[in-house]
């Protein structure tokens, strides 16, 4: 320390991706600017900012904090504080008098006498942490003053506060995480397989054969028959009555001179009934008509596809009973 340079009274540490940077502050000589700077450190405002401006072998500068201050600070130049070596920390301004702020700060890498009485000097880098500043200054650049991968401030530690009345701002105090209200769980249905097995032991499956031979079931069916006629019984009786009436009709023969006897009529009736059955069977079957090829040399001139289903027909019995006179 120069014999003319006053002693520092406060101290903070900026933790960066290139290593820690320890800064000692002249809080007594530059009270207003150092007070705001320490308050920003208490509120962790510099966390997340980067050294986005790098001028080789000259200086490095941080980006602005997320919530810049609207209050402009007055110039606090001190006759014993000069930019006469590397590792000095200064406040930025708006290129005019009494417009200083510590939303961003810079660190020199060489003596910069041109900054005297132009920028406010309020701190200096201590110990070996100056080499971490050199690492930041040696970063690869993607443009004239912009680094390819800028170093970032990840944490801040207050080592010597000096201003005892400073506390962390309430709006920056992290609120404890609120516990989420537990949702009422729906009661789960517990399946008791033991009880189900016990209930199933009294149930026995029976086959269809066993059911038919079951005496209880047969008694029920027999009881149902006794209660009254079912629909099937009524149909059976109707069929029997129809058969009896048809038999009586067969026996009745009109008195005609050409009567041939009951046996002959019965045979003819059987033939007629068989023909009727064949006719009904043919009607039940699907009517597939195959197209026939006619030979004009041997086949007669007729329409083989002619539909005669709607023509009048006469059975054999009626044919026998009718008299046809020749004209």
Swiss-Prot record:
GO biological process terms on file: mRNA processing; RNA splicing
Lineage top rank: taxon: Eukaryota
Basic and acidic residues: bias regions: 228-269, 277-296
UniProt keyword terms in alphabetical order: Cytoplasm, Isomerase, mRNA processing, mRNA splicing, Nucleus, Rotamase, Spliceosome
E.C. numbers: 5.2.1.8
Entry's transmembrane regions: none
Domain PPIase cyclophilin-type: 8-158
Stretch list, region Disordered: 223-307
General function of this protein: PPIases accelerate the folding of proteins. It catalyzes the cis-trans isomerization of proline imidic peptide bonds in oligopeptides. Involved in pre-mRNA splicing.
Assembly, per entry: Associated with the spliceosome.
Name of the protein this chain belongs to: Peptidyl-prolyl isomerase CWC27
